Structure formats: structure tokens, C-alpha cells
């Protein structure tokens, strides 16, 4: 399969292209997708390149568009005008490849989006694609995305990116209303949704105002995994992430949670001098003890270094339990029943790593 990605250097395009390359190069074998060529088209590409790519593509992701033009009239030129050029070029080559359009929930023109010039331009692009599908028989997949959360330029089009950058870089920022709620789609979930599309497993939907309603016969497509959070909740999480190297407290980030995705995004904004941070080594004549990570509900991880011939321990706890793992050197671990005096012992070595319950 040859895949054309327009807007390939944008936030979504960059993430999608990088992940498509992982599949093409055999680094991601979790998907049933065979990729030969990935054609990357962006503002610095030529019409000749677009012509070549449209002749050869087996599937097209149209991510190109504008969202912050200096002149509002450029919304229609950037979002509708290029879409027309792309579809005309595909028609020229009689290429009926499937094509995906990246649209926006603003195209509903519902609620606060009723007067959105951006929404009108996206709506016009949608109708153009649907008409193209009727005219040519080519499969058309229109996605109306909510706020996207991924690594992008701060102070531009994403409050979350701006907050991540500001907190990570100790910059001042303003939250106008902590109660404002955002519905966001994380970039990794979007990419997985595009892989589902390539495998013929896309989700269809309709819209009730700005709300997505799953419908297997729906006109639109969607990535159903979104998250809702207030600006206050987002900023509080970011401040917690920032304090982690000091408190050592690992934030609660269950698999698939908004917190886990936000933490992953936050780390992409760290300046390089914050990639490394010091740990406090508590040293004495016996060796050292260093706490690495604390968790809210799963205890902590630490490193205990003992000098040769040193005995540590000689105490007990009521409910606390530990696992000792020797990763270097040799040692003898002895556990004693305080009621009977019975002792069991385990010889341990970094040459054969084992865990011992205490």
C-alpha cells in the first residue's frame, strides 16, 4: 500500500507519518497493514510532487489545513481551496483510493461554534468530500475531531501545549477560568484510530449538536476515546508532575487514563537540563540507602548498598512488607520468627537475580 499524507509536517501529520514508518519498517507488528511508500506532502512541496503522489497513492490522509490565519478569508482558501486541488488531482488520474478528511467539531456550527469562520470552511470541505465520493465512488471518511492533545507549538493553538511548556520551563502563564472544561483527543489515540481505518475497522457516527453519537450507518467517522477535564484539573496535574523529582511521588497514572497521557506529553516539553535530576543518598559507615520512587498506593522503590561484612536489619514491622532483590554482589538474607526463633536463610547473588519476600 502507498499512503499519501498531506499536512505531513503538522502535529497530527508528524505523529501519523512516524508511526506509519514504524509499521513499514517492521518495528510495529501489531497491525495487519502492509506499507510500501509513504508520500509526505506539506507547504514546501511542489504541485509536481502532489501530482505524482495522487497518481500512485492507494490511500490518502488529508490533514492539510489552516487554523490561525492572519486574515479570516484564508480559512476558506486553506481548508476548502487545497481540498479542491487535491480531489481534482485524484480525479485527473482516475484514482479512486480511499481518502480521509481531518475536519473539526466546529463544522457542526452548533452552540458556540455557530459563527465560526473556521467551522464554515471545514463544513464546506466536508461537503466537497462527500460529493466527491458520490461522483467517483471513492470511499470517503470524514472525521470531526475535538481538541487535539499532542506535542505542538506553545502559545499557538493549544492551551494544553502552552501549559505543558510553561510548567516544564518555569514560565508564567494564566488560566482565565479553572472551571472551563475541554474534551480532548490524545494524539496516540488518533493514530490508532487511523490504523483502525486502514484495517477497515473505523467507527462511524452522527452528531447531536457537538456531541458524537456512535452509529454504524453514520455519515461521519470518529475516534471514540476522548477525555474531559477542566483547565484547573489539567494545571493541577502538571504541577504534580513538576514536583515529582523533588517529592519522588509518582502520580497515579492508570493505563489509558488522561493523567498518563498528559504526563507523557508534559515530558516532551522538558528542557534538556531537566532530563537528569539528583537523588539523595543517605550514607554511613555501612553503605548507603537511596529512595527512588514513591507511589500513592504501592509503596516505594529504593536502593540499599551494603559494604562487605555489614549486617543490616534486626527489626520487624506489623503490616509493612518488602521485597529484596540483590542486583550486584553476594549476600545472605536471614528471616527470624520472633515468636519461635526459627530462622530461614537465602543466599542471594547478582549473578542469579531473585526476589525475597520479607
Predicted regions: what is each one?
Residues 43-85, 89-92, 106-113:
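NAD(P)H-binding glycine-rich loop region in Rossmannoid oxidoreductase-like domains
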Residues 318-338:
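Glycine- and acidic-residue-biased ligand/ion/polar-headgroup-sensing regions
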Residues 2-26:
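N-terminal Rossmann NAD(P)H-binding glycine-rich loop of SDR-like oxidoreductase domains
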Residues 130-142, 146-182, 187-200:
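NAD(P)-dependent short-chain dehydrogenase/reductase
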Residues 337-358:
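Short acidic-glycine-tyrosine-enriched beta hairpin
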Residues 273-314, 320:
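A short glycine-rich, His/Asp/Glu-containing loop-to-beta-strand
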Residues 196, 200-281:
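Mid/C-terminal beta-alpha module of Rossmann-like enzyme folds, strongest
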Residues 84-126, 133-136, 141:
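Conserved Rossmann-fold NAD(P)-dependent oxidoreductase catalytic core, especially the SDR/UDP-sugar
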Amino acid at each position: 500500500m502507498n499512503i499519501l499524507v498531506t499536512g505531513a509536517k503538522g502535529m497530527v501529520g508528524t505523529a501519523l507519518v512516524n508511526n506509519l514508518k514504524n509499521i513499514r519498517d517492521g518495528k510495529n507488528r501489531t497491525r495487519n497493514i502492509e506499507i510500501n511508500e509513504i508520500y509526505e506532502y506539506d507547504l514546501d512541496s511542489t504541485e509536481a510532487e502532489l501530482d505524482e503522489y495522487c497518481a500512485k497513492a492507494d490511500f490518502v490522509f488529508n490533514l492539510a489545513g489552516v487554523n490561525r490565519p492572519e486574515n479570516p478569508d484564508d480559512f476558506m482558501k486553506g481548508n476548502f481551496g487545497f481540498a479542491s486541488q487535491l480531489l481534482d488531482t485524484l480525479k485527473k488520474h482516475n484514482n479512486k483510493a480511499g481518502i480521509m478528511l481531518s475536519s473539526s467539531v466546529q463544522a457542526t456550527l452548533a452552540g458556540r461554534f455557530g459563527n465560526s469562520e473556521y467551522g464554515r470552511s471545514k463544513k464546506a470541505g466536508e461537503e466537497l468530500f462527500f460529493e466527491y465520493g458520490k461522483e467517483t465512488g471513492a470511499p470517503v471518511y470524514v472525521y470531526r475531531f475535538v481538541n487535539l492533545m499532542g506535542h505542538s507549538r506553545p502559545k499557538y493553538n493549544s492551551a494544553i501545549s502552552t501549559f505543558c511548556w510553561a510548567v516544564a520551563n518555569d514560565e508564567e502563564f494564566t488560566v482565565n477560568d479553572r472551571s472551563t472544561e475541554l474534551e480532548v483527543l490524545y494524539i496516540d489515540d488518533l493514530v490508532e484510530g487511523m490504523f483502525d481505518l486502514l484495517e477497515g475497522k473505523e467507527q462511524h457516527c452522527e452528531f447531536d449538536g457537538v456531541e458524537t453519537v456512535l452509529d454504524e450507518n453514520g455519515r461521519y467517522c470518529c475516534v471514540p476515546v476522548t477525555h474531559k477535564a477542566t483547565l484547573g484539573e489539567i494545571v493541577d496535574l502538571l504541577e504534580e508532575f513538576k514536583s515529582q523529582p523533588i517529592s519522588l511521588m509518582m502520580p497515579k497514572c492508570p493505563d489509558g487514563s488522561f493523567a498518563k497521557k498528559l504526563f507523557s506529553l508534559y515530558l516532551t516539553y522538558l528542557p534538556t537540563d531537566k532530563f537528569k535530576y539528583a537523588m539523595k543518598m543517605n550514607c554511613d559507615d555501612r553503605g548507603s540507602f537511596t529512595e527512588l520512587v514513591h507511589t500513592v498506593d504501592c509503596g516505594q522503590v529504593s536502593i540499599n548498598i551494603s559494604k562487605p561484612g555489614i549486617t543490616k536489619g534486626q527489626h520487624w514491622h506489623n503490616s509493612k512488607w518488602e521485597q529484596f532483590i540483590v542486583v550486584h554482589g553476594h549476600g545472605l538474607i536471614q528471616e527470624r520468627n520472633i515468636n519461635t526463633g526459627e530462622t530461614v536463610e537465602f543466599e542471594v547473588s547478582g549473578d542469579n537475580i531473585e526476589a525475597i519476600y520479607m
